[in-house]
Each structure stands twice: as C-alpha cells, then as structure tokens.
Amino acid sequence: MNIIITGASRGIGKAIAASFAGKGNHLFLCARNEKVLSDTVAELQVKYPAAVIHARPADLSEKEAAIQFGAWCLQYGIPDILVNNAGEYISGNIIDEAEGNLEKMMAINLFSAYHLTRTLLPQMIGVKPPEGRSRHIFNLCSIASMQAYCNGGGYSISKFALSGFSKNLREELKPHGIKVTSIYPGAVMTDSWSGFDNTGKRIMEAEDIAAMVLAATGLSPQAVAEDIVLRPLLGDL
C-alpha cells in the first residue's frame, strides 16, 4: 500500500512509519528537519528492507509546501492511507501567549492537514482501490481537542479545529467509501514531554499510538473506527 505520513521524523510519526514499514509498504514521509528525516529513513530502511521509503523535507505550515508535497507523492501513485500527524505544541494562555502563537498553531496543526488532504482527495476519490480494500485518512488530534485546559491557548484551539475538520471530512467522504479516523492521544513520551522521567511508565509511548493506527487499518471496508481516544492508564497529567 502507498502510505503518506507527515511529521514522520520522530515521535508518533516515526512510530507509525515503523509499524507500516514492518509490513513492507511503500511509505512517503515528510518533516521539517532534513537531517533528522534522513536519519529516520536510513534507520527504517535497514530495519525493514522490504519497505520502500521515499522522503522529502517540507514545512507543511506553509500552504504551497503542503500542496507541493502532495503533488510529489501523487507522482508515485495514489495514497491508500494518509496520516496527518504534523504538528507542534507551544503552551500559553489566551490572555498572554506570544503574539502570533494562535496563527502559528493553526498553520501547522490544522492548515497543514487541510491543504495536503485537499491536494490528494481528487485522486483518492477518482480512482477506486482494489476489491476488498478502502482508502483511509487519519488525523492526529489530541485530548486537547476534547477538553479545554489552562495553558492550552492557541494549541488547544487549533486541535479543537482539527477535530472539527476531521468530523466534517468523514461525512463528506462516506459516499466515496473513504474512512476518516480521528486519534485523540493523551500524554505520550515525545518531544513535547522532553525532560519528563518516564522510567515508571506513567505516560504512553509513541508505539502505543502507532499500534492503534495499524489496528484500525485492519477492519473490513464496511467498518471504521471513527474516534480513538488513548490515555495513560493512570489518567491525564
């Protein structure tokens, strides 16, 4: 299968890429940091030699970059699975967060998925997948998409918006047989939690999220996991 994963150089995106690479799929990856992305591709290719991995550095917070990345992917084939994972967390309260923080959060956490998805959809809709298969779009939302909290600011607003995008997209694509799944992770050991001592396994690992994404792709064409909420066993922090 052809699988596009954004924000794939580290954290949840890298874990999802590894889970699909382990199945010998064709991967199309992007991230902003070219060096880290290149290192990730090399690591995955050694570990999963049956996978075919293409990668391109891109800052999807820029509209044209998102469109160009989508067009580049389409040169190789029509995606079976799209994972909109690119995102960033910057804490702050509405009253005093840095000027422009909301715009920045919206650009990377919402508009990146919006513009990339719009670029890919005509082909995903226009060409039917093989019998017994369906195309699938995953949007990596957050617990912050479901529950407001102090210090969430522009980040939480952007994630609420991404959840709304995902729900609207699901309704639009039902007649075309394309699944849309929203993932709502709680605390995950990624860069957002750098410095946190997780030796006691208080919060989740990126591989937990990847396992659920992979599992959701295994359902029959007539079934979809619409919303997947994952939290640490002991609850949110």
Feature locations, PLM:
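Conserved glycine-rich Rossmann-like NAD(P)H-binding loop of the short-chain dehydrogenase/reductase
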Residues: 23-39
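Residue(s) in the substrate-gating loop at a strand-loop-helix junction
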Residues: 142
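C-terminal helical subdomain
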Residues: 182, 198-237
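Active-site helix of classical SDR
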Residues: 117, 158
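The beta1-alpha1 cofactor-binding region of Rossmann-like NAD(H)/NADP(H)-dependent oxidoreductases
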Residues: 34-35, 57-68, 99
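Substrate-binding pocket helix/loop in short-chain dehydrogenase/reductase
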Residues: 93-94, 101-104
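Conserved glycine-rich cofactor-binding loop
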Residues: 9-11
